Amino acid sequence: MNRAARAIRAAAAVAAAVALLAVAGCASGLRSGAEPTVTYALRAAPVAGSAKLLDVAVRVDRAVPAPGFASERILVVREDRRLDHYSGSRWPEMLPDVVTALAIETLRGSAALTAVHDQRAPFTSDYLLLITIRHFEADASGGGAPQVRVALECTLGRRDDRVVIATFTAAGSASASANRMSAVIAAYEAATQQALAVLSTRTLEALTLDTSTN
């Protein structure tokens, strides 16, 4: 390779390096100016302990999300039924994991069951609770403060013979007091707690009936 060719090659390498640095600088600038993400956590409602302890263990499998709900994003329905999400806001985990954890916490809080655990626990269980997330969104299509809707389809069955003993929908709704994020999250929590209270009550009723007849 002659001297001229080496000079051209060296100049090209320098130009490429400068271009890469410029791109990296732009990307860094974009990241530094991006809106920070705020993570919101929901709390399970305190549940009054049951007067009767059922000698059964329940396993709660990871909730199954309906289309659009397999995300950590906080969803909102806009005009024309457009499913969107609140920018700069998220749940601490994927929504199915959030719902599953809250359902387990609520059932444990009832103090009516020998044990309640998730599908990862290496323990045996007598019953299995399956949850499908049908609704978990804020509806802002009306233009005012959003209304939050939560609907969980539940199937409860025995583990030994795979017999379904109950199917029901646990639902809740709440209107945000204002069109701001803190009020929307408060409405999410209220609607979720309503739905989980129904889930706990219906689950315990079904277990009480099944254990008394078997």
Regions from the PLM with identified roles:
Residues 22-25:
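C-terminal motif of bacterial Sec signal peptides marking the signal peptidase cleavage site
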